[in-house]
Amino acid sequence: KFEKNIVYNPKSELSYLYLSKIFKNFDNKKLQEQNLNTVILLNPKTEEAIFNLAKLKLESSDYKKSRELNEKLNSFCKNFCNKSKRLKSEIENLLKK
């Protein structure tokens, strides 16, 4: 369904966001990341996509990129501010180890 929507509306950031969630459920990190990057390309201020990509980078031990994405999110967040703060603590704790 989402893929069909993308064919008719290739700039539908929500379709890519939903696809990234589907790939997360299938544990396909490569396609999850690809779709999150597409969302951010279409709309660089999509909080959920930036947060999810930061989490994904953290899971793959890319602390630097995760922190960078989280700082970007924190600079304009409205809905994901609390999640961003928790993620910042999580990153800092992992960096201490």
Give the location of each predicted region.
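Structural signature of tandem alpha-helical TPR/SEL1-like repeats
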Residues: N25-T38, S60-L69
